[in-house]
Amino acid sequence: MNEAATKWFTDNFDTVKYCVTDYHELLNKEDIDAIYCALPHNLHGKVYSDIINAGKHLLGEKPFGIDAEANAEILKACKNHPEAIVRCASEFPYYPACQELIRWIKDGKFGKIIEVRSGFKHCSDMDPEKPINWKRMIEINGEYGCMGDLGIHAEHVPFRMGWTPKNVYAKLSNLITERPDGKGGRVPCLTWDNATLVCDTEDKDGSVFPVTYEMKRISPGSTNEWYLEVYGLEASAKFNSNDPNGFVYTDSWGKEQAWCRINVGY
């Protein structure tokens, strides 16, 4: 526990009611209904399960477990406590322009879908001298590397639209295999930096189309870039967080199409 960081909160916010060094103390307090928990992935299985089993609502950070075994433990707690609200979400789909794209999906404006592309990309790890941190360590982050951290952002809308993968082909890259340890030495960096997944999925009409997911920590020029693109025979549309007010679309007619852009406000 970082006592200096904790003291900053207690010194600057008189609304802080409890300050504890053992999270079990929070679980035993009857006046606490919900807990927001952000911890390294290797702690998710036990701590998340303890929160749910204590009857508290949980707002958790992805990926809900360092591996399948830890995730199964959390899901078991959820099943045993259906009264507990357990949530994790990506904020990006709630831009008004992206909400417009989602409405188009729900309204069936795209017709027969050709393909969907969704991704979340960073560029901060392009610096090979950036010191290693826990998200680059398999024993703390997990073997899935960037997919566990960035995956929910790319998968949020497609999964909510019912486009779950029927199969998965993955191209995974570990581009920088060692980093400074912050103490003058160098250590192995074994997690996946970039992942591209190509999946078949099925639309509600039974037609099958490909979905491509990009999850990248090393993507030149991408500063927290999130995007969603849907291509169909009757219409296509795109959203990119680099242009958060822009809803880009085209209606398909004949052999030629033109991309249009409109501002979507709140």
Give the predicted meaning of each segment.
Residues 33-34, 40-41, 45-93, 108:
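Beta-strand-loop-alpha-helix segment that lines the small-molecule cofactor/substrate pocket
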Residues 18, 34, 115:
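Short, Asp-centered acidic motifs that coordinate Mg2+ and/or phosphate
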Residues 1-14:
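N-terminal Rossmann-like dinucleotide-binding module
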Residues 16-22:
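Conserved SAM-binding strand-loop segment of SAM-dependent methyltransferases
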Residues 228, 244-260, 264:
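Short polybasic amphipathic segments
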Residues 8, 25, 34, 46, ...:
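Alpha-helical elements of Rossmann-like donor-binding domains used by nucleotide-donor carbohydrate transfer enzymes
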Residues 155-248:
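Contiguous beta-strand/loop segments that form the cofactor/metal-binding neighborhood of enzyme cores
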Residues 84, 92-189:
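Predominantly a Rossmann-like dinucleotide-binding segment in NAD(P)-dependent oxidoreductases
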